[in-house]
């Protein structure tokens, strides 16, 4: 005869609400403890790990706030979030560094190029019957000259060259303060 003791009920409640119990521990309590520990030890790699984690946690929170209604339709979302944040938090996986290095940092360093990469769809890969073998830049230049004329194209090039020469003579550069050999 199966027993219906209080211990079995508590265990069932814990299992059913695992995500509700584990999520605050994994997302807030452990990272908070590890962040304070990193500050106290003055370890640069640990500081970087936890700063990147908090940046990503803020982005995840913004995503959840923005899409809270559609996320209610996905009952697996809390488990996916728990799994993903475990990957970000645990230093063995170094997930926060990976995501920051490959997705956030390129966007931060050059937002225009990063968004262009996201929305750029090369026509050659999807066009089974290409009309010409020219590069996309050459095609765009030809279209511009057809629409606006060669004189407008030449003026645009001269304007760009004079702008670049003016910037270089004034010593102005458009580089971020981070070097390319920076850890992240």
From Swiss-Prot:
Predominantly expressed in flower buds and stem. It is a multi-pass membrane protein. The chain crosses the membrane at residues 13-33, 51-71, 73-93. GO terms for biological process: hyperosmotic salinity response; response to abscisic acid; response to water deprivation. It is found in: Membrane. One of its GO terms (cellular component) is membrane. It holds the Pfam family TB2_DP1_HVA22. The keyword Cytoplasm does not apply. Keywords: Membrane, Transmembrane, Transmembrane helix. The keyword Transmembrane applies. Belongs to the DP1 family. This is HVA22-like protein c. It comes from Arabidopsis thaliana (Mouse-ear cress). The lineage of its organism: Eukaryota, Viridiplantae, Streptophyta, Embryophyta, Tracheophyta.
């Amino acid at each position: 005869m199966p027993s219906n003791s209080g211990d079995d009920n508590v265990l069932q409640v814990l299992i059913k609400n695992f995500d509700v119990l584990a999520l605050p521990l994994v997302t807030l309590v452990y990272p908070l403890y590890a962040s304070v520990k990193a500050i106290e030890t003055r370890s640069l790699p640990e500081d970087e790990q936890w700063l990147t984690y908090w940046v990503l946690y803020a982005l995840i929170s913004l995503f959840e706030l923005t899409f809270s209604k559609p996320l209610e339709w996905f009952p697996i979302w809390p488990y996916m979030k728990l799994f993903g944040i475990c990957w970000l938090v645990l230093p063995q996986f170094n997930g926060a560094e990976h995501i920051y290095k490959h997705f956030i940092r390129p966007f931060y360093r050059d937002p225009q190029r990063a968004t262009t990469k996201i929305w750029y769809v090369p026509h050659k890969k999807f066009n089974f019957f290409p009309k010409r073998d020219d590069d996309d830049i050459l095609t765009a230049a030809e279209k511009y000259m057809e629409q606006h004329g060669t004189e407008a194209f030449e003026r645009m090039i001269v304007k760009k060259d004079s702008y670049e020469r003016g910037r270089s003579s004034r010593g102005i550069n458009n580089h971020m303060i981070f070097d390319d050999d920076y850890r992240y």
